[in-house]
Swiss-Prot record:
Cellular location(s): Virion membrane; Host apical cell membrane
Tree of life domain: Viruses
Record Pfam families: Flu_M2
Further remarks about this protein from its record: When the channel is activated, one or more imidazole moieties of His-37 probably become bi-protonated.
Main subcellular localisation: virion
Domain comment, as recorded: Cytoplasmic tail plays an important role in virion assembly and morphogenesis.
HAMAP family: INFV_M2
Biased composition (Basic and acidic residues): 71-80
Membrane topology value: Single-pass type III membrane protein
Record topology, Virion surface segments: 1-22
Name of the protein this chain belongs to: Matrix protein 2
Organism: Influenza A virus (strain A/Hong Kong/5/1983 H3N2)
Length: 97
């Protein structure tokens, strides 16, 4: 006998649930959470390229350069690159006794 026939049985020409605890608040909350989880999972699978591209490129953006002259933007880029280059040459040697 399948699980479907054990849970749902025809009652007066309609399909109903034999479960008497379906009005229990915990069962209702679990059902709502399950449905929301399913909806979010479907949306994630449908739009994952858009969502993760937004996070990937959106979170890596630097400070806004709107209204800043191009010469100052170039100077800022050079300072950032110099800071990265300077960090590459510093190493810490730790000796354990």
């Amino acid at each position: 006998m399948s699980l479907l026939t054990e849970v749902e049985t025809p009652i007066r020409n309609e399909w109903g649930c034999r479960c008497n605890d379906s009005s229990d608040p915990l069962v209702v909350a679990a059902s709502i959470i399950g449905i929301l989880h399913l909806i979010l999972w479907i949306l994630d699978r449908l739009f994952f390229k858009c969502i993760y591209r937004l996070f990937k490129h959106g979170l890596k953006r630097g400070p806004s350069t709107e209204g800043v002259p191009e010469s100052m933007r170039e100077e800022y880029r050079k300072e950032q690159q110099n800071a990265v280059d300077a960090d590459d040459s510093h190493f810490v040697s730790i000796e354990l006794e």
